[in-house]
Amino acid sequence: AAIASGFAIEIDLQLSRDGIPVVFHDYELDRLTESSGLIADLDADELESIVLIGGKRCIPRFDNFMEYVAGRVPVLVELKDQDGALGDKITALEGAACEVLRKYKGPVAVMSFNPNMIARCAMLAPEIPRGLVLDAFSETDWPKVSDTRRKELAAVTHYSNVGATFVSHSYSELHSEKIIELKKSGALIFCWTIRSKAQSKQAKRFVDSVTFEGYLPDDIR
């Protein structure tokens, strides 16, 4: 539906047990499928057989998904932090994702809450545009992250270091001084997740584009 309408697509990547990136938002299967357990505990072949709730589609491998899109619309790829600590632990996800991205012919960008993952993408696939995903980094949402680290991330201190050109910020905190500063400096500002035309209208006073679900917007911006 997104491709037919000309909308860009935002996807999330997790890593299977055998080191293959798959398109899935959650760390656990329970909310979005009839199965249960961790994505990381299953091989990609097993995940590809798990049906998503509300349809006949299964969890796709990243490379197969990108082959299907084939450059018809832009794709925004979020690398999910793999340990919840937003630290500097190197995972196989960055390398596996960048291997696919380097071969892809079409508009694409990569982003993450974890700036260390984006820094590694800068080394592995420097030609791919990069960005940071942001929110308030509260202790409630990020219980495994130290207070010092959360404050550092909220201040967006890594934006220039990783060569970012955009941020994607939570809708509820778009009015922060840091976002205003970034926009003035030339950064593209996206936001997530918009769930109505009313929210979209309000958000677009501040942002360049929105990640949306549950409704069809009047334009593709």
List each model region and its residues.
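Metal-dependent phosphodiesterase/phospholipase catalytic core, i.e.
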Residues: H25-F137, S160-T165, H169-Y171
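Active-site flanking residues adjacent to catalytic metal/cofactor-binding acidic residues
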Residues: I9-I11, F24-H25, V77, F212
